[in-house]
């Protein structure tokens, strides 16, 4: 213990004063709204351009809306936010730069690809746990059309995608992290930080295969650091089963691995 928390193993921390997630705001595109998680989103947009002239502006608009929803639901103002940890998939973080411009909150721009939300929550929780902020905003966004332009081919090019190609989410999530003891919807008991694991995947159409080795390594590192055995696990589910699992989360203590799996410990 160092006054802030206990380091556990190679890459994990258990917070001495676990911060809470006070509120969240979520915005999705039309395709995402039609999926199994659609009913959990605060706002499903009928227009993926959000009424803007281009896709990049649309992604910025999603960030503005998600942040606004999180603040409104938490009955908080921009002036009460000490820091913002936010990011997107674009060069120079342009969606975040323009999307956060209207918030007037000190910003740490993050670029962690699909780990950005987990990274934002982790760094935000560390900041609050250490006493450097009372309220911190964590946010991440992506947009199918902007990601296609950035990493593959612009939609106007008309490139043919294989049926097995993964689809970048059009959406944004924002969460307000507050101090231990405050009313919240979840508690961040600790974090496990992942590392780069390159398995040699070179198919730009298969993002899942490229990310899976690092995600698996992080999960296994968490179990090792916290000395969790398979006997302590009550269940595990992929993101396909999240809708059913989510309904059981209330008043229960879970560890959530963003975009990968949900685990529950008997003695967490």
Residue ranges of model-derived segments:
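Active-site nucleophile and cofactor-binding loops and adjacent substrate-binding regions
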Residues: 55-59, 85, 106-118, 165-167
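Short acidic capping loops at alpha-helix termini that bridge into adjacent secondary structure
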Residues: 77-83, 134-135, 229-232
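Anion-binding (especially nucleotide phosphate/pyrophosphate-binding) glycine-rich loop
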Residues: 78, 84, 88-94, 102-103
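Condensing-enzyme catalytic core mediating Claisen C-C bond formation in acyl metabolism
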Residues: 1-56, 153-221, 225, 261-267
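Short, solvent-exposed loop/edge-beta patches enriched in aromatic
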Residues: 15, 70-80, 132
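Disulfide-rich extracellular domains of secreted proteins
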Residues: 215, 228-230, 241
């Amino acid at each position: 213990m160092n006054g802030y928390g206990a380091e556990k193993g190679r890459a994990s921390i258990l917070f001495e004063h676990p911060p809470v997630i006070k509120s969240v705001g979520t915005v999705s595109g039309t395709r995402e709204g039609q999926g199994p998680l659609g009913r959990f989103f605060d706002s499903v947009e009928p227009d993926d351009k959000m009424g803007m002239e281009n896709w990049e502006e649309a992604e910025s608009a999603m960030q503005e809306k998600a942040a606004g929803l999180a603040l409104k639901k938490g009955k908080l103002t921009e002036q009460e936010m000490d820091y913002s940890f936010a990011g997107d998939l674009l060069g120079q973080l342009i969606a975040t730069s323009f999307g956060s411009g209207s918030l007037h909150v000190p910003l740490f721009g993050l670029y962690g690809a699909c780990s950005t939300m987990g990274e934002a929550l982790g760094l935000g929780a560390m900041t609050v746990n250490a006493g450097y902020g009372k309220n911190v905003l964590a946010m991440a966004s992506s947009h199918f059309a902007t990601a296609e332009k950035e990493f593959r081919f612009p939609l106007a090019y008309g490139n043919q995608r294989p049926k097995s190609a993964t689809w970048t989410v059009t959406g944004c999530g924002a969460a307000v992290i507050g101090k231990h003891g405050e009313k919240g919807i979840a508690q961040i008991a600790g974090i496990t930080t992942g590392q780069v694991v390159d398995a040699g995947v070179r198919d730009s159409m298969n993002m899942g295969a490229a990310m899976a080795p690092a995600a698996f390594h992080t999960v296994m590192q968490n179990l090792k650091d916290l000395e969790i055995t398979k006997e302590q696990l009550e269940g595990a589910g992929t993101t396909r089963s999240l809708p059913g699992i989510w309904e059981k989360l209330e008043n229960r203590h879970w560890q959530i691995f963003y975009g990968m799996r949900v685990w529950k410990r008997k003695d967490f």
